[in-house]
């Protein structure tokens, strides 16, 4: 039996972004609106600090989705769907 699963575990996602980094499409679904965006910086005192740029999005298919870009390696993840 597997152990407990973490809720809202970040999962990799394909994002097409504008030149300024704002998401334009997520998994080939157009972004209708960016509802909110924020920057999280944590663990700055460690050898591997955490820096993420979050976006709360409204997608063309009606879904609301939160994604972030990891500033360390540039990869995109979905946090909540």
At which residue positions do the language-model features occur?
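Non-catalytic peripheral regions of nucleotide-handling enzymes
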Residues: 1-81
């Amino acid at each position: 039996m597997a152990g407990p699963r973490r809720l809202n575990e970040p999962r990799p996602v394909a994002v097409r972004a504008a030149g300024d980094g704002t998401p334009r499409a997520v998994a080939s679904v157009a972004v209708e609106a960016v509802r909110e965006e924020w920057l999280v910086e944590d663990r700055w005192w460690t050898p591997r600090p955490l820096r993420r740029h979050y976006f709360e999005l409204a997608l063309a298919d009606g879904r609301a989705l939160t994604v972030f870009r990891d500033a360390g390696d540039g990869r995109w993840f979905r946090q909540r769907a």
